[in-house]
Amino acid sequence: MLLTAALALAAVSRLVDAAAVAIDTRAVVDGEPTTVDRTLLFQPPDNYTDPRTLYARTVELSDGKLLATWENYSPEPPPVWFPIYESLDYGQSWTEISRVQDQVYGFGLRYQPFLYELPQAFGDYPAGTVLLSGSAIPTNLSETNIELYASRDQGLTWEFVSHIAHGGVALPNNGETPVWEPFIYVYEDTLIVYYSDQRDPNYGQKLVHQETTDLVNWSDVIDDVTHSTYTDRPGMPVVTKLPNGQYFYVYEYGGTSITTDYSFPIYYRIADDPRQFADAADHYVNASGYIPVSSPYAVWSSVGGENGSIVVSSGRQPLFINRALGDPDAWELYDDFDQPAAYTRSLRVLAEDDDFLLVAGAGVLPPSTTNNVTVSVYKISEILGL
């Protein structure tokens, strides 16, 4: 009996050791950051439905590993999922490691995924937990549900955590009531999820956030951006911290604010507290008369001078850089790079060296039968000509 138990314990020990070795081997990040010229991350099969892929997002984990996901238009049934791909060489090559499935409704995880690594513990989830937020939406688009999932093993397995927001039909029409486009950020002991909200009858769409300290219990909805004209549609919020301690909040402003035709120029606000953008002044990105439109993303890098560089992407090809902490008169346009326009490109400066800017895209809005997922890595200093 004791011998049997001892042998069993030894066998378990060997399995645990083998698993640890496998995990450690998988987790090794190879080499150093380098530039990458538009590498193909994922080519969807021919049976994928239009638009095939959209809305690529990435996260860099604390050990240098990169994860990527996107809207994935696989044929249904079965329900759609968010794929998780991993890079161990700073974006040069990628491998699928898991799929985040809808574990609650069975609708499928359909729209607008976002990845984030916890810098500190929240509730039962330790620092290093990877979070994914996105929308569970049925095939008929009859409702929207912004959900929170978590991975305790760097993206290999996933568990449902909580519901953040529920809305109506997934159509971007004024009068409908969906919720869209989550973005996660941690401030002090609070985790914030920013998103677009059409549920308020006073606004075609507004920008809001909700807060949590345990990933399970969420605050009431807090307004971030509202505009007095009902048909205005601020959307797609992204937040990044500046070196002076302020926070840069970028969004698209659907409306006629600066044009006679309805368009989506890129606006931004700057605040001392990322929970208090509602009273901050509006500015728009304008680089010598070129005003970018739609699907923004923003990051900050220390490269570019004493204030570093705010880098903004839009739905068009160029990047827009501000080296004066968001001064409205200091935007510069740069378009000498190969990563194509997309809905929507995401940006990431690499922690090992924030001169390296990773740009990911998954194609354009339908009809778009040639979409795929690509990644490029550039040096901001080279973009700036430094």
Question: Predicted regions span which residues?
Answer:
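Fungal secretory targeting signals
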Residues: M1-T25
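Long, low-complexity intrinsically disordered regions
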Residues: A6-S13, G175-P178, I192-V193
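Beta-rich carbohydrate-recognition and catalytic domains
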Residues: A19-L54, V59-R110, L118-N174, V186-Y230, ...
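Conserved beta-strand position repeated once per blade in WD40 beta-propeller domains
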Residues: Y55-R57, Q112-F114, E181-F183, M236-V238, ...
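His-enriched metal-coordination microenvironments in redox/metal-binding proteins
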Residues: G204, G235-M236
